[in-house]
Amino acid sequence: MSRISKSEMSRLLSVYFIMGSNNCTKDPLQVLREALEGGITIFQFREKGEGALTEEKRICFAKELQAICKEYGVPFIVNDDVELALELDADGVHVGQDDEGITSVREKMGDKIVGVSTHTIEEARWAIENGADYLGVGPIFPTSTKKDTKAVQGTKGLAHFREQGITIPIVGIGGISIENTASVIEAGADGVSVISAISLAESAYESTKRLVEEVSNSL
């Protein structure tokens, strides 16, 4: 197995759904299934914060979500937990700046997908040099889902990464909705990552379909 190509990674980032059990008011397994039917291209398991599952329940829930992703042939990424990603044989892992360092993550994950959240050009260059396959850049807009977010960057912050010669695939993160998706793609992102735009939507399926349309119309 070799590392994922840049073009394939870019394609997979189009509509990147992130979810944990505490991000939904409906059955999360049904929400994920609807999102997959609607056309999400990659999924990240992020079981964190108030009311999140722990220990064995967390692992069992992750396995259920992973099995659904497999049915649809969509990559299953684990947030922040390299050991869990390895235990599940997940397709990859996504780490932040305060998590395990990219060098040791890449070493442990082999050729699997490794994504890194970055907020500065320096962080981006370090991540690229040490084996990141894609960057999560943000928060682009204010968000209520994450309590520990950095300063909002806006689409200008995202465009700055491209202006500084960062060519690796980028997914925009933070406060992204159907209404502002086009501006994120136009600023230079390959895709958008969302939590509540799908997880709290009246119809996860319809919301995902609209996100897919917005991205494809803007690329």
From Swiss-Prot:
GO terms for biological process: thiamine biosynthetic process; thiamine diphosphate biosynthetic process. GO terms for molecular function: magnesium ion binding; thiamine-phosphate diphosphorylase activity. It catalyses: 2-[(2R,5Z)-2-carboxy-4-methylthiazol-5(2H)-ylidene]ethyl phosphate + 4-amino-2-methyl-5-(diphosphooxymethyl)pyrimidine + 2 H(+) = thiamine phosphate + CO2 + diphosphate; 2-(2-carboxy-4-methylthiazol-5-yl)ethyl phosphate + 4-amino-2-methyl-5-(diphosphooxymethyl)pyrimidine + 2 H(+) = thiamine phosphate + CO2 + diphosphate; 4-methyl-5-(2-phosphooxyethyl)-thiazole + 4-amino-2-methyl-5-(diphosphooxymethyl)pyrimidine + H(+) = thiamine phosphate + diphosphate. Mg(2+) binds at D80, D99. Belongs to the thiamine-phosphate synthase family. 4-amino-2-methyl-5-(diphosphooxymethyl)pyrimidine binds at Q44, F45, R46, E47, K48, N79, S117, K146. This is Thiamine-phosphate synthase. InterPro entries: Aldolase_TIM, ThiamineP_synth_sf, ThiamineP_synth_TenI, TMP_synthase. The keyword Transferase applies. Pfam families: TMP-TENI (PF02581). The keyword Disulfide bond does not apply. GO terms for cellular component: cytoplasm. Gene3D superfamilies: Aldolase class I (3.20.20.70). Its EC number is 2.5.1.3. 2-[(2R,5Z)-2-carboxy-4-methylthiazol-5(2H)-ylidene]ethyl phosphate binds at T143, S144, T145, G175, I195, S196. Keywords: Magnesium, Metal-binding, Thiamine biosynthesis, Transferase. Binds 1 Mg(2+) ion per subunit. Its cofactor is Mg(2+). Condenses 4-methyl-5-(beta-hydroxyethyl)thiazole monophosphate (THZ-P) and 2-methyl-4-amino-5-hydroxymethyl pyrimidine pyrophosphate (HMP-PP) to form thiamine monophosphate (TMP).
